[in-house]
UniProtKB/Swiss-Prot annotation:
Top EC class of this enzyme: oxidoreductase
SUPFAM superfamilies for the chain: Ferredoxin thioredoxin reductase (FTR), catalytic beta chain (SSF57662)
Keyword presence, Amino-acid biosynthesis: no
Cofactor remark from the record: Binds 1 [4Fe-4S] cluster.
Positions of [4Fe-4S] cluster binding: 57, 76, 78, 87
Keywords: 4Fe-4S, Chloroplast, Disulfide bond, Iron, Iron-sulfur, Metal-binding, Oxidoreductase, Plastid, Redox-active center
Cofactor: [4Fe-4S] cluster
Cystine crosslinks: 59-89
Gene Ontology cellular component list: chloroplast
High-level lineage: Eukaryota, Rhodophyta, Bangiophyceae, Bangiales, Bangiaceae
This protein's name: Ferredoxin-thioredoxin reductase, catalytic chain
EC numbers on record: 1.8.7.2
Amino acid sequence: MKKQNLVSFPENLEAMRKFSETYAKRTGTFFCIDSSVTAVVIEGLARHKDQYGAPLCPCRHYEDKKAEISATYWNCPCVPMRERRECHCMLFLTPDNEFASDLQEIDKTTLTEQIS
């Protein structure tokens, strides 16, 4: 599959980091206590955005990623997250989730260290 080189991967990574922070704050959700989970999910969203032009949920298997992107159901934030605040990836956790931290931000250094 041909890569869309509209924006470089580092720019998409930063865009997904900012999106994740903003969305967590807006929805009153929190990142996982294990920052590597948060980092890997943000990286996956950025890679899908880089490859396909959309932040398709990286925690699921798809037979046809382009079809899934067109359907929009699993584009982040996915329908289960928007409707029920259920994030399969554990990126956005409700405060009562045993794996939720008290963080709604992840700095660039932590993100980069966790995915290198």
